[in-house]
């Protein structure tokens, strides 16, 4: 036997359902539609913010290499206002480059450390880390340089990382560790014809023979 024996009973059942639950259903539909609109508004707002940030970044970069002081001021302001943006780390790298033109190595190190901290991109982190380690070697901060390179970084940067480690070890007078690092850098695929690296290894060999 059917639950509903006639069309009239079905109609009355529908009426009863809407009488009891209609408000909740309509509210749910309204909220769902509002949520859909809200999500799209959020996406549109997010996109708009990204475009504005991109435009601001381009404006800051236009002054790079033209007016150092103005660029440093506007770039620092941009980073402070956009700490969570991927552009913050790129701006920090640009500030490091600007400071390097004046051989202000301590300031270069500060900007590179900022780029490492603010970036979620492993490639940018690796670039900034290798550059920071080289600057730390320039500042005779050899232990700090090795610590900078001790974190996990993309395998594609292994050659540059090992070579920089070798430079730090060499400056510390740790010839064997330097040789191992240079060899590890040279052993990376595609680096077998790296003349500069091979020269460093040859120089170490000569130093070792003289020491004997």
Which sequence ranges carry the predicted segments?
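Amphipathic alpha-helical repeat elements characteristic of tetratricopeptide repeat
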Residues: 8, 47-54, 69-72, 90, ...
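Membrane-interface junctions
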Residues: 17-24, 81-84, 118, 155
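Transmembrane signal-anchor/signal-peptide helices with a preference for the extracytoplasmic
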Residues: 34-55
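Flexible helix-coil transition and linker loops at the boundaries of alpha-helical arrays
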Residues: 41-45, 79-82, 117-119
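Soluble extracytoplasmic domains of inner/organellar membrane proteins
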Residues: 88, 92, 100-212
């Amino acid at each position: 036997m059917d639950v509903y024996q006639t069309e009239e009973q079905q109609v009355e059942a529908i009426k009863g359902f809407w009488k009891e639950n209609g408000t909740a259903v309509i509210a749910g539909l309204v909220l769902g539609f509002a949520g859909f609109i809200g999500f799209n508004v959020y996406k549109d707002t997010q996109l708009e913010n990204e475009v504005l940030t991109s435009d601001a970044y381009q404006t800051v970069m236009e002054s790079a290499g033209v007016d150092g002081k103005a660029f440093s001021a506007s770039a620092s302001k941009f980073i402070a206002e956009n700490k969570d943006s991927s552009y913050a780390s790129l701006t920090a790298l640009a500030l490091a480059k600007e400071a390097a033109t004046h051989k202000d190595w301590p300031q270069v190190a500060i900007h590179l450390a900022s780029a490492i901290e603010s970036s979620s991109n492993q490639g940018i982190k690796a670039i900034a880390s290798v550059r920071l380690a080289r600057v730390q070697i320039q500042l005779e901060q050899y232990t700090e340089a090795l610590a900078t390179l001790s974190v996990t970084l993309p395998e594609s940067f292994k050659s540059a990382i090992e070579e920089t480690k070798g430079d730090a070890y060499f400056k510390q007078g740790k010839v064997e560790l330097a040789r191992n690092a240079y060899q590890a850098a040279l052993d990376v695929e595609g680096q077998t014809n790296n003349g500069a690296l091979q020269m460093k290894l040859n120089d170490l060999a000569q130093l070792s023979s003289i020491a004997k």
